UniProtKB/Swiss-Prot annotation:
Compartments where located: Cytoplasm
Family: Belongs to the GlpE family.
This protein's encoding gene: glpE
SMART domains (UniProt xref): RHOD
Top-rank taxon, per record: Bacteria
Name of this chain's protein: Thiosulfate sulfurtransferase GlpE
Amino acid sequence: MAAIFTEISPTTAWQLVKHENAFLADIRALAHYLDDHPSGAFHLTNDSYAEFLDLVSDEQAVIVVCYHGISSRSVAQFLVEQGFETVYSVTGGFEAWQKLALPVTKGCDQ
């Protein structure tokens, strides 16, 4: 059976970040990331992938967030294929995150 990622709600994602040390990766365009992003999120791009690999530990779950929860699925599946064991995609993306009034940060916090 092929490994797959799991879709989770923004609330569950935030709980995993806060209480389980999950690694949150925002894959939206830089301009949108800088406008605001989930608090603590790393801006993951092709260019920052090597840094991502240095930062994330083998034990950490990785949570991927995009605009609406669509693009994050393909990135989550890519990470599973790269050997990450616990990978999640945020259902509804950053739009849903904002609607739930979960914590956001403006600017760059990397």
